[in-house]
């Protein structure tokens, strides 16, 4: 894969996607959107944990990826900027870091 990437880079500039958080904000997700069914009774507010949307709203996350691809992005990044135990601890979700990261990768691949 790396060799193919270098080959393409020799002939043209590749475009990366843009800010994921900015796109998420445009959707106006509510606390209920972030929680989904799975985290409905979670004891901490989850709004703002954008990485969790790969689990609770994968269709919307995929749609954001598709919009970037339609706009001309050659490379998209996963929605997992804060999908690590330290950042997710703010939401009591540190034990879900691996699952959220895997979900984010799966959603990006599906786009």
Give the residues covered by each predicted segment.
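Domain-level signal for soluble alpha/beta catalytic cores
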Residues: 1-111
């Amino acid at each position: 894969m790396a060799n193919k990437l270098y080959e393409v880079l020799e002939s043209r500039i590749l475009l990366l996607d843009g800010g994921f958080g900015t796109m998420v904000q445009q959707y106006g997700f509510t606390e209920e959107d972030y929680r989904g069914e799975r985290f409905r009774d979670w004891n901490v507010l989850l709004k703002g944990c954008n990485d969790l949307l790969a689990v609770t709203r994968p269709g919307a996350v995929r749609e954001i990826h598709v919009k970037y691809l339609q706009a001309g992005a050659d490379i998209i990044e996963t929605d997992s900027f804060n999908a690590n135990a330290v950042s997710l601890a703010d939401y009591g979700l540190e034990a879900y870091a691996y699952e959220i990261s895997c979900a984010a990768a799966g959603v990006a691949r599906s786009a």
